Amino acid sequence: MWIENTIVLVTGGARGLGEHLSRAFAQEGARVVVNYHSSDERARALVSELGEDRALAAQADVTDAQQVRDMVSRAREHFGAPITVAVNNALVDFSFNGDARPTLEHLTAENLTQQFQGAVVGALNVMQAVTPGMAEAGEGRIINIGTNLFQNPVVPYHDYTAAKAALLALTRTAAKDLGPQGITVNMISGGLLRTTDASAATPDEVFDFIAAGTPLGRVTTPEEFADTALFFASDWSRGVTGQNLVVDGGLVMD
């Protein structure tokens, strides 16, 4: 599977890291389904920029299975082919600001449930919607976006980190289940990225602290992170599944 003309779904693809992922795939010639929940204006502006023959703005709440199925059907009707690459990037609104996070003392089950719904249930809904088309095509790539925080919780975002750790477990069990159909499932785990919507509230001293802890001496960019998604979407990764690749400049070595 080469990326050119491949139908790629990026959930949460209109802003933040998702926008960089959508752009990266479009630059390689893919046809991109830019999913969004509430960022209608940004999604349509991005699609207009990428070209309406190459991109489709698709509103859906990924936590709603029926909305996801409808979105996948619309994408197939629009492009005339099934989605064969799905990037589960959508995130419940979250600000990476350690000063504003709930400490363990104040963490609630509702905090955990909200993040679990976005990260795990959302990814499950997407996988269930796209895998029939992938099986029909004889191949597919599912790429889940994780975090290095469950290996190195430099800031203890309890709810977000726990949900992403659960997503890693689902990544590996799904890889086992879907492998016979020619579908690979992998995770890319970044650290702090400079800069996305989610990290916009991060103080400069935190960026400096993270950069000082990496062999490269800098914070990873969204563009560098997106490059790894291109690898997992291509034939270069055809022998790789069930893996978690950390892209954080070497802050975590695992």
Please give the residue ranges for each predicted region.
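Catalytic loop of short-chain dehydrogenase/reductase
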Residues: V92-F96, T103-Q115, R141-A166, T171-P180, ...
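A short, exposed helix-loop element centered on a Lys and neighboring polar residues
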Residues: M127-Q128, R172
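A glycine/serine/threonine-rich, flexible loop-to-helix segment
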Residues: L46, A100, D159, P180, ...
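Conserved glycine-rich cofactor-binding loop
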Residues: I7, A14-R15
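Short, small/polar-rich loop/turn modules that mediate ligand/substrate recognition or access, typified
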Residues: G179, T184, V240-G242, D248
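Alpha-helical segment proximal to the catalytic Tyr-Lys
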Residues: P132, K176-D177, R238
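The beta1-alpha1 cofactor-binding region of Rossmann-like NAD(H)/NADP(H)-dependent oxidoreductases
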Residues: D40, Q59-V72, A109, E223
